[in-house]
Amino acid sequence: MDPKISYFQTFIVASKTKSFSKAAKRLGITQGTVSNHISALEKYFDAQLFLRTPEGVDLTPEGKIFYERAEKILDLLNEAKLLMRAIHENPEGIIRIYASTTPGEHILPSIIKEYKSSYKNVDFEITITDSERCFKALDEGLADIAAVGYLKNKNYEYTIIGKDRLVLIVPPNHPLAEKGTAKLEDILKEDYIDREEGSGTREAFIKALNDKGYSIMDLNVVMRLGSHSAVITAVSEGYGVSVVSEIPAKKAEDAGLIKIVPVVDLDVVRYLYLVKSRRPKNPSAVKSFWEFVTKV
C-alpha cells in the first residue's frame, strides 16, 4: 500500500526530535501510531530508516536520503495547496456559458457585471441559443454553465436566477390593442409567430395550451423564428401575433414597436435557471461564480 502524506510528516518530526515518543507528543498521536507509520514507510521502501539507540533514534544512510526528499515533497505539497487556495480566492480564466435568449440577454449581463467587479481575471464566453441546445452543450462538455428557461430534469445542479411572465404581443394598430384585453381563443384565430423548437418560451406556452385543452396544432403558425427580437420585429411589421417573454416585450412596447395585451384566461409564469456542468473545464472559476450567484 502506498504511504500516506501523514506518514511523511511523522517521519520528518521523528527525524528532527530523534525520538518516537517526542514525535508522538508533538503530533498529538500515540507512540504506537508513530511506529506504525515508520514501519509502513520502511516496508514501502524496503529499507531501514532509523537506528534505535539508548537516547532515541538516528537516521540510517537510507533514512538520510529519504529525509531530504521527504522535506522537498512536503514543501511542494504545501506550495501546491497555497497556490490552489490562491486560485480559489482569485480565480482566473474563462467560464463558458450557453444561454437561452431571455436569461442570456436580459438577466446574465447584470449578474456578470457585478461578479467581475470583484473577480476581474475571470472572463465569460457566452453562446446564445435555445434551451434544448444549452442542455446538449452541458452534456457534451461544451458549456460549464447553462442559463435556461426550463429544467430538462432534476438531475442537474441548478439555481433560480429570475422569474419571467409570458405576454401576448400584437402590432400597435391591431384590433386587440385597441380592445385592451384578449382571450386565449382570440390568439387561436390570429396568424401566430412561433419560436423555434427547443425554446424555453415555446415549451412554457405549449404547456399552458395543454393545460387549457389545446395544443400547438391549434395555432395558425405562419413562421418560426429563433429569438425574441426576431419575433418582436415580425409582429411589429404585421406578420402576426405572438406570446413572448415580458422582459424584452416591455422594452419593445416602450419603443412603440408592439403592444402588450393582457390575456384574461392565460397566466404563464416561469422561472429562469442557471444549471451547472458536472465536469466544468475551469472548476475554480465556475465554483467561484456559482457561489457568488447562489449567495446573491
Curated annotation (Swiss-Prot):
Domain HTH lysR-type: 1-60
GO terms (BP aspect): regulation of DNA-templated transcription
InterPro entries cross-referenced by the UniProt entry: LysR-like_Sec_metab, LysR_subst-bd, Tscrpt_reg_HTH_LysR, WH-like_DNA-bd_sf, WH_DNA-bd_sf
GO MF: DNA-binding transcription factor activity; transcription cis-regulatory region binding
Gene3D superfamilies in the record: 3.40.190.290, Winged helix-like DNA-binding domain superfamily/Winged helix DNA-binding domain (1.10.10.10)
Keywords from the named record: DNA-binding, Transcription, Transcription regulation
Signal peptide: none
DNA-binding region: 20-39
PANTHER family xref list: HTH-TYPE TRANSCRIPTIONAL REGULATOR (PTHR30126), HTH-TYPE TRANSCRIPTIONAL REGULATOR GLTR (PTHR30126:SF40)
Protein name per Swiss-Prot or TrEMBL: Uncharacterized HTH-type transcriptional regulator MJ0300
Source species of the chain: Methanocaldococcus jannaschii (strain ATCC 43067 / DSM 2661 / JAL-1 / JCM 10045 / NBRC 100440)
Record lineage: Archaea, Methanobacteriati, Methanobacteriota, Methanomada group, Methanococci
